């Protein structure tokens, strides 16, 4: 039969989304990646119009029967025009024929997969009884991260800190309304993380956003700093961490200043990285072992995950 190519916009994705289902799909993709059952090249970054970046990320898997392409445009000046700084799309192709099945709005999908990846990390690395979640950053990614972490742990209260207090206040109200949970806003990131069991940093910062040492038992999801010169978490955190986990050993050391900068400073070596997240999912490596451990998950995204999330939305749309 004929394939009718579908465009799946943000609104449709939001209606189709069940975060618990997405988390399970994302686990499959992360595991397949770590078992070398995907082809996920390092992303291409093409500069244009001075500060803008065009990122191109193909990925496929014979194991998962998926093939697709993600594109992202990063345009920092857009915020001044009231436009999104990050836009993009995911193209999902048919594994048998290569025909284009669907083009999906990449903004919402990125928010979902970013959240889901850290949700998976939190599931395996945070304390079972974690109650307090601290989020540094009140941007687009933060909401997806909160939704995914609430799916894997019984969080009772959320702390928010952001560069702009007003933005943090507005974001907090949005989170209260949406998830019916207690949310407190802090002026300083250090105060926000001091009593937290789980910390998420999701900012566009070039410099570390907190200075305090992480307490025993904390799990950190570091999600910002997607460029080699961006550092969101202090180098010292790498020394405190008992386990540092990444999506891709290869990509992590290439793509983020959170690892590149401490590496250049001689603080972090490659053998200090505990494992890829996929190896913990498969049981090849262990996750959290004690209540006292400090665990760090550094996320830069992985195109095979975007493609599996695209497939999830496409399948749900076809079913409905």
Regions found by a protein language model. Name each.
Residues 138-139:
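Glycine-rich Rossmann-fold phosphate-binding loop(s) that bind the pyrophosphate
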Residues 4-111, 119, 129, 275, ...:
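N-terminal ligand-binding/catalytic initiation module
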Residues 181-262, 267:
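Rossmann-like adenosine-cofactor binding region
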Residues 126-132, 154, 215-216:
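Short helix-loop-beta connector
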Residues 152-178:
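NAD(P)-binding Rossmann-fold cofactor-contacting core
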Residues 11, 229-320:
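Adenosine-phosphate binding glycine-rich loop
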Residues 133-134, 295:
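Conserved beta-strand elements of the Class I
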Residues 142-143:
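N-terminal Rossmann-fold NAD(P) dinucleotide-binding loop
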């Amino acid at each position: 039969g004929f394939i009718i190519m579908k465009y799946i916009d943000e609104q449709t994705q939001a209606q189709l989304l069940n975060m618990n289902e997405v988390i399970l799909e994302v686990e499959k993709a992360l595991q397949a990646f770590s078992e070398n059952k995907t082809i996920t090249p390092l992303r291409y970054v093409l500069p244009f119009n001075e500060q803008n970046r065009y990122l191109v990320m193909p990925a496929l898997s014979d194991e998962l029967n998926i093939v697709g392409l993600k594109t992202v445009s990063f345009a920092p000046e857009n915020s001044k025009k009231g436009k999104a700084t990050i836009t993009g799309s995911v193209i999902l192709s048919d594994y048998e024929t290569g025909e284009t099945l669907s083009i999906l709005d990449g903004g919402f999908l990125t928010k979902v997969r970013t959240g889901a990846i850290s949700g998976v990390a939190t599931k395996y690395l945070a304390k079972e009884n974690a109650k307090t979640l601290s989020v540094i950053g009140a941007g687009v990614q933060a909401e997806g991260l909160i939704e995914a972490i609430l799916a894997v742990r019984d969080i009772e209260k959320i702390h928010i800190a952001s560069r702009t207090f007003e933005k943090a206040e507005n974001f907090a109200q949005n989170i209260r309304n949406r998830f019916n949970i207690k949310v407190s806003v802090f002026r300083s990131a250090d105060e926000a993380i001091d009593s937290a069991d789980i910390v998420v940093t999701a900012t566009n910062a070039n410099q570390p956003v907190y200075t305090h040492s992480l307490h025993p038992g904390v799990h950190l999801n570091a999600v910002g700093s997607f460029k080699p010169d961006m550092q969101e978490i202090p180098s010292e955190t790498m020394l405190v961490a008992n386990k540092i986990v990444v999506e891709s050993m290869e990509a992590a050391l290439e793509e983020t200043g959170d690892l590149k900068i401490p590496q250049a400073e001689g603080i972090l070596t490659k053998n200090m990285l505990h494992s890829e997240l996929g190896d913990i999912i498969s049981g090849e490596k262990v996750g959290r072992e004690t209540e006292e451990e400090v665990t760090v998950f550094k996320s830069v995204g992985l195109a095979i995950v975007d493609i599996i999330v695209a497939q999830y939305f496409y399948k749900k749309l076809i079913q409905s």
